[in-house]
Amino acid sequence: MIIMRKTHPLLKTINHSFIDLPAPSNISAWWNFGSLLGICLVIQILTGLFLAMHYTSDTSTAFSSVAHICRDVNYGWLIRNLHANGASMFFMCLFLHVGRGIYYGSYLYKETWNIGVILLLTVMATAFVGYVLPWGQMSFWGATVITNLLSAIPYIGTTLAEWVWGGFAVDKATLTRFFAFHFILPSIVTARATVHLLFLHETGSNNPSGINPDSDKIPFHPYYTIKDALGLMLLLLPLLPLALFSPDLLGDPDNFSPANPLNTPPHIKPEWYFLFAYAILRSIPNKLGGVLALLASILILLIIPLLHTSNQRSMMFRPISQTLFWILAANLLTLTWIGGQPVEQPFIIIGQLAIILYFLLIVVLMPLAGLLENYMLEPKW
């Protein structure tokens, strides 16, 4: 008997990726976030498409077009709330996915890890240009502050900033091009996610123990399709109440006011998922230094495979490294909190200490912990 999914050229690829894929038998719920990110991406693309049908990317009508979507379009309020809060769930899954990769040593699949870091940067860029589109106060001033960082680049900075703006400040041309970027970038994210998956299936999934799982694998379907379906339900559990009952909980009240270049908000800050990076940017008094620290805080992920010193892949049996990992997680939460606070003492010094600890943990302490654990496990007789 010919089984269509095993012979048809297209179905065969899907079959090898999602049905007959051999998967380790012991992967935990931490491995659910990959599929959840895929689902988040689909939700964002679909809701975004329907929003784009009614949105106008002109400075004089952008704000009112968003109000029109919420008031006059059938279920427009729901589509917008799902899109805005779906972004928050997307980043929550993204951070947990990266955290799991660091904890269990998944970064040793270098190709998968590197394309993943590029994916993270692309998603961050997509979210940034998307936040500008409603053309509220925080949208406008957020765009002004972040794009102005380009002017910190020596020699070409000012020219580069004006090139991105399409003028001498954030204005109509900027909004139009940001809408174009926000429309095309999800397609690039989808393509890169496919490459990410392609590289992953070259090696197979890692597992909590970090040991080669080839001797004990099970088919992806039905075991992990059921597990991913449960993960989806648990994702919808916070997303739907958030979108239906308190959709503006994670937003900024300033964004309910139309953009006004003559009136600066008292505290300019991005969405919660960028606060850690914003805190790093603000913690350094020098403009160029802040920009470099901001870039380094994300790009440092690319060198994590080179800093792996342990004989064991996973942190599952490495208590010293585990402790440092959770200090790093707490440190990132501290940076997120600092990013939302005004630029005054004691927040400035807390932010500066947190950024020093962040780089110290990744570059020095965690590699040293790996070497120490190797030494402790060596037989001494």
From Swiss-Prot:
Entry GO terms, CC: mitochondrial inner membrane; respiratory chain complex III
UniProt keyword Chaperone present: no
Pfam families: Cytochrom_B_C, Cytochrome_B
Free-text remark on how the cofactor is bound: Binds 2 heme b groups non-covalently.
Topology within the bilayer: Multi-pass membrane protein
Coiled coil regions in record: none
Binding site for heme b b562: H83, H182
PROSITE patterns per the UniProt record, alphabetical: CYTB_CTER, CYTB_NTER
Binding site for a ubiquinone: H201
Gene3D superfamilies: Cytochrome Bc1 Complex, Chain C
UniProt cross-references to CDD domains, sorted A to Z: cytochrome_b_C, Cytochrome_b_N
Cellular localisation: Mitochondrion inner membrane
Chain residues that bind heme b b566: H97, H196
Cofactor or coenzyme needed: heme b
Claim: Signal is one of the keywords in the record: no
Keyword tags: Electron transport, Extinct organism protein, Heme, Iron, Membrane, Metal-binding, Mitochondrion, Mitochondrion inner membrane, Respiratory chain, Transmembrane, Transmembrane helix, Transport, Ubiquinone
Entry's Gene Ontology BP terms: mitochondrial electron transport, ubiquinol to cytochrome c
Miscellaneous remark of the record: Heme 1 (or BL or b562) is low-potential and absorbs at about 562 nm, and heme 2 (or BH or b566) is high-potential and absorbs at about 566 nm.
Assembly and interaction partners: The cytochrome bc1 complex contains 11 subunits: 3 respiratory subunits (MT-CYB, CYC1 and UQCRFS1), 2 core proteins (UQCRC1 and UQCRC2) and 6 low-molecular weight proteins (UQCRH/QCR6, UQCRB/QCR7, UQCRQ/QCR8, UQCR10/QCR9, UQCR11/QCR10 and a cleavage product of UQCRFS1). This cytochrome bc1 complex then forms a dimer.
Protein purpose: Component of the ubiquinol-cytochrome c reductase complex (complex III or cytochrome b-c1 complex) that is part of the mitochondrial respiratory chain. The b-c1 complex mediates electron transfer from ubiquinol to cytochrome c. Contributes to the generation of a proton gradient across the mitochondrial membrane that is then used for ATP synthesis.
Protein family (similarity comment): Belongs to the cytochrome b family.
Protein's UniProt name: Cytochrome b
Gene behind the chain: MT-CYB
